[in-house]
């Protein structure tokens, strides 16, 4: 009887771990075209390669709302599930991406800027989808979500405003955008993709207070522990469009890593940030297998304090611009899959001015 109870307990524990460790991935695209800027584009041919890979390898492509509602309700996510998203609502999403998506019957989400759409409403040469086109897509089940009224950064404060005044102004702008989306498509998910992926702690608190789920641009998988004020997405356009690199990302697992108090800060002047300390909850990896890389700095030395905490002293000053630390480790229980966590920084010039986009 004792052995039977031990077996039942072990099976129950394994099942619990399996359900909780299920991971999903959100892919981020912009243009699907051969003639648009390479840094935000994937060719139609390569986009179809991506979708074929998803189908051939039994990934579950689901509406973004399935994943977010699962996290909100703490319902286990289908393992190897994927959501497809497009930022900026370019016309080639309709003319180039949609026929391919329809071929595979894959759902997707488009993040839109209502102010930009409205300015181009009578422009036949516009590169942006119209409300008529977006309504038709909405009627077919495409999720239409918020990318801000204009494509303005949430953290680049202008007009001499304080942080509080700026957030009040941005709240009005974002709610205006949400209302316009609802008026034209009937949808209001309160899903918001940060323009340029830029955010800070104050913006995260603002998103939570205003009941917005906010999506960023740092990489990583998601699970039930994901912070809904900075949901990661994997960029899948050039130069990250090769299947060889996408394969590991699609199979990645969410790394349950958090930041020490005061280290969630994302914005520093050049040469200001020197180190960072992480808390980690997972036991499903060997410490020796953990690797962390930082943009332009390469692989970093990891300093373990105990089994649940480690630090990185940056090998050089973080470069000006958008910077990422990517930490990965092979899973013990799921061979061939990697835990993946990304921490973003937005490094200003030494005088405190913003870098150029």
What residues fall within each predicted segment?
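Metal-dependent polysaccharide deacetylase catalytic core of the NodB/CE4 family, i.e.
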Residues: 27-39, 57, 72, 78-82, ...
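Catalytic-core region of carbohydrate-active enzymes that cleave or remodel glycosidic bonds
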Residues: 176, 181-185, 206-219
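Beta-strand-enriched, solvent-exposed domains that form extended recognition/catalytic surfaces
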Residues: 257-357
């Amino acid at each position: 009887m004792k052995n039977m109870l031990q077996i039942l307990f072990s099976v129950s524990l394994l099942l619990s771990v399996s359900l909780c460790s299920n991971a999903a991935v959100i892919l981020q695209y912009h243009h699907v075209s051969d003639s648009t800027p390479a840094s935000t584009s994937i060719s139609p041919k390569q986009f179809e390669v991506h979708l074929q890979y998803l189908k051939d390898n039994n990934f579950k492509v689901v509406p973004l709302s399935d994943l977010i509602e699962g996290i909100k309700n703490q319902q286990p996510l289908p393992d190897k599930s994927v959501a497809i998203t497009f930022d900026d609502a370019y016309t080639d999403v309709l003319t180039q991406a949609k026929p391919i998506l329809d071929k595979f019957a894959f759902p997707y989400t488009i993040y839109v800027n209502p102010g930009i759409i409205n300015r181009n409403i009578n422009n036949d040469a516009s590169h942006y989808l119209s409300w008529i086109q977006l309504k038709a897509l909405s009627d077919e089940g495409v999720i239409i979500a918020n990318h801000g009224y204009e494509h303005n950064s949430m953290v680049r404060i202008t007009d001499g405003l304080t942080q509080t005044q700026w957030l009040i102004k941005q709240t009005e702008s974002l709610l205006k955008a949400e209302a316009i989306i609802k008026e034209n498509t009937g949808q209001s998910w309160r899903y918001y993709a940060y323009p340029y992926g830029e955010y800070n702690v104050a913006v995260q608190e603002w998103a939570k207070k205003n009941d917005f789920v906010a999506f960023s641009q740092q990489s990583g998988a998601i699970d039930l522990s994901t912070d809904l004020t900075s949901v990661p997405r994997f960029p899948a356009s050039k130069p990250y469009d090769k299947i060889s690199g996408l394969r590991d990302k699609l199979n990645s697992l969410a790394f349950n890593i958090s930041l020490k108090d005061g280290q969630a800060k994302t914005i520093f002047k050049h040469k200001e940030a020197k180190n960072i300390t992480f808390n980690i909850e997972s036991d499903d990896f060997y410490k020796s297998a953990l690797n962390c890389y930082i943009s332009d700095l390469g692989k970093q030395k990891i300093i373990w304090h105990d089994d649940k905490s480690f630090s990185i002293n940056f090998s050089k000053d973080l470069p000006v611009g958008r910077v990422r630390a990517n930490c990965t480790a092979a899973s013990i229980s799921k061979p061939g899959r990697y835990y993946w966590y990304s921490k973003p920084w937005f490094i200003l010039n030494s005088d405190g001015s913003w870098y150029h986009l």
